[in-house]
Amino acid sequence: MRPLQIVPSRLISQLYCGLKPPASTRNQICLKMARPSSSMADFRKLFAKAKHIVIMSGAGVSAESGVPTFRGAGGYWRKWQAQDLATPLAFAHNPSRVWEFYHYRREVMGSKEPNAGHRAIAECETRLGKQGRRVVVITQNIDELHRKAGTKNLLEIHGSLFKTRCTSCGVVAENYKSPICPALSGKGAPEPGTQDASIPIEKLPRCEEAGCGGLLRPHVVWFGENLDPAILEEVDRELAHCDLCLVVGTSSVVYPAAMFAPQVAARGVPVAEFNTETTPATNRFRFHFQGPCGTTLPEALARHENETVS
């Protein structure tokens, strides 16, 4: 991967539209800045005045709700990590296995609820909206927990577990069926010794559009695929107009999303990172608050005594 470059917002969708897996640390080149502040009081002063807040969220937010991340040493489904299965090639080679993986993830979400971090974001959006201020969430997560918490201004740049896309006619549809098809009932167990179900392709989820019946796939962005240009245009607009940015629970290593916050910081907008650890981008930002997002976000986004009302 080439060195990180700062580009005008209008060029992001042209240069960094393909989802790429994490690069090695030595290939992540970040400009060094002063150590970020951890002063909540200073952050809160900026928060009280901000008119247009962008919150970018990643897997770390949902991990606190018990959602598997499929990353790191223990992040396996059977013997595979997400980047082994979340590819067009994997689906073409073994659609049954890929559907088992996503069926498991869909079923797991039935028992998961938004945590304090999700709720703090949703409450902040509602409260500030009544003051004529804008809060928008740009999330890499596909679990819909932000939506479940009540977030309205939401850009799900990597898609959703609960949407499907037909590989024949291209129709995208919401799908909350459990199981998504009879053949997947009871399938998808994550334990390493579990054998593939090897479901015949004709019994996998099929399109219900009249006269189609094509094979459905999860409506998520897989590694090697481009993000939706229309969504990227919306992202560009939000990044160009925001006056405060929060980066919440994201590792800042999956592109193109890893590019967004550094680009905002490069034009002088305060960026605050909320994470359980530092990331390759930490020193690009004004603030860094270390700890669980469910602990740090409620304090950061609570009503401020000096909140400006339009």
Swiss-Prot record:
Signal peptide: none annotated. The keyword Transferase applies. The keyword Phosphoprotein does not apply. SUPFAM superfamilies: DHS-like NAD/FAD-binding domain. Monomer. Homodimer. Interacts with CPS1. Interacts with PCCA. NAD-dependent lysine demalonylase, desuccinylase and deglutarylase that specifically removes malonyl, succinyl and glutaryl groups on target proteins. Activates CPS1 and contributes to the regulation of blood ammonia levels during prolonged fasting: acts by mediating desuccinylation and deglutarylation of CPS1, thereby increasing CPS1 activity in response to elevated NAD levels during fasting. Activates SOD1 by mediating its desuccinylation, leading to reduced reactive oxygen species. Activates SHMT2 by mediating its desuccinylation. This is NAD-dependent protein deacylase sirtuin-5, mitochondrial. It comes from Pongo abelii (Sumatran orangutan). The gene is SIRT5.
